[in-house]
Amino acid sequence: MSVGLKVSAFLHPTLALSSRDVSLSSSSSSLYLDRKILRPGSGRRWCKSRRTEPILAVVESSRVPELDSSSEPVQVFDGSTRLYISYTCPFAQRAWIARNYKGLQNKIELVPIDLKNRPAWYKEKVYSANKVPALEHNNRVLGESLDLIKYIDTNFEGPSLTPDGLEKQVVADELLSYTDSFSKAVRSTLNGTDTNAADVAFDYIEQALSKFNEGPFFLGQFSLVDVAYAPFIERFRLILSDVMNVDITSGRPNLALWIQEMNKIEAYTETRQDPQELVERYKRRVQAEARL
């Protein structure tokens, strides 16, 4: 069996790996590429590509260990506001980015959960769905990442992530509704079921990034849409590059600029994983599944 072509479990929130698999070094890690790169579905269209910029991950040196089955229960509904995440889950990363961008680090406590060895009390006392992200606020617990980033933006102070104007609101809704289809398309290429699907999906992203010229982001200015896509584009970029020698930015200048500008936003970069560790964890999972 071919190894390196399955990604669905890697991106599912309930199957995310624990913090033991994530580098917690405060130093940044860089990954430079100098290779022939083939865009998915492009047949014989090869191009020689050399990256001059590093793929960076800024990892918070102050990250606390994830809570596991041996951890004492959190005192739920004691008046605190808590965001339950996993450091390796892209869905949880969305809510984490929103919390950081709003400047709520001192108002929303981050509670990392080890999803491979999760505490029983998390399901029993915190969130019956037993997934992350989950937000404890005003004596109730809310879930679902897209709902949470909207909730955080609406119910807490800080810079707005919601677009102004009806046109941008309509486009935002369309792009947010496409997130699942985007992920499924890229996964189908990685799984080998549709070699052209990722190419089509990233072309859609490239076109979407050209709609508004006020800035490099989906709606011109940084918004909920960027928060929703960033964790997945981050992972797909690294995995496609390493596993399939694919440069998703080749022929896509808007996407290349978007990635460059996203890497200037601290609220995002401080949630990122070490890129080499991310890819290695993916490969280990695929190898394990290939042996089943």
From Swiss-Prot:
Keyword Transit peptide (UniProt): yes
GO CC annotations, alphabetized: chloroplast; chloroplast stroma; cytosol; peroxisome
SUPFAM superfamilies according to UniProt: GST C-terminal domain-like, Thioredoxin-like
UniProt domain GST N-terminal: residue ranges: 79-160
Residues in coiled coil: none
InterPro entries named among the record's database cross-references: Glutathione-S-Trfase_C_sf, Glutathione_S-Trfase, Glutathione_S-Trfase_N, GSTL1/2/3, Thioredoxin-like_sf
Gene Ontology terms describing biological process: protein glutathionylation; response to toxic substance
Family: Belongs to the GST superfamily. Lambda family.
Descriptive protein name: Glutathione S-transferase L2, chloroplastic
Species whose genome carries this gene: Arabidopsis thaliana
